[in-house]
C-alpha cells in the first residue's frame, strides 16, 4: 500500500484574498488553479495568477481536510497570524 502525503495549502490570489485547499500533489494543484480548472473560487480571472504561500503535510486525508476547514473559519486577521506562526513545507514555486 502506497503511503501518500496529504497537504493543506494556502494560495494568495491576485486580488489579495486567501484560498485554502487540500491535495496530495502541490505542484499539480497549483498548476490546475492557475489554468482555471481548480476550485470555483479560483476560476475567476481577477483572482489569477495564484501563488502558493503555505503548505502543511499530514499523514491522513482527514487531518489535512480538518486543517483546511479550520483555516476557512478564520477571519482575515486570524489567517494572517496563522500563516506567520505555522511552519510550511517547501513549496512548488520555491518559497
Region roles according to the model:
Residues 40-43:
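A short linear hydrophobic-aromatic micro-motif
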Residues 1-38, 48-58, 62-72, 76-77, ...:
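GIY-YIG nuclease catalytic motif and its immediate N-terminal context
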Amino acid at each position: 500500500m502506497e503511503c501518500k502525503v496529504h497537504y493543506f495549502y494556502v494560495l494568495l490570489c491576485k486580488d489579495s484574498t486567501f484560498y485554502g485547499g487540500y491535495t496530495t500533489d502541490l505542484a499539480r494543484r497549483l498548476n490546475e488553479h492557475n489554468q482555471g480548472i481548480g476550485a470555483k473560487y479560483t476560476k475567476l480571472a481577477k483572482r489569477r495568477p495564484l501563488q502558493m504561500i503555505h503548505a502543511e503535510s499530514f499523514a491522513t486525508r482527514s487531518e489535512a481536510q480538518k486543517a483546511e476547514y479550520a483555516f476557512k473559519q478564520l477571519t482575515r486577521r486570524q489567517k494572517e497570524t496563522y500563516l506567520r506562526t505555522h511552519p510550511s513545507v517547501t513549496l512548488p514555486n520555491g518559497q
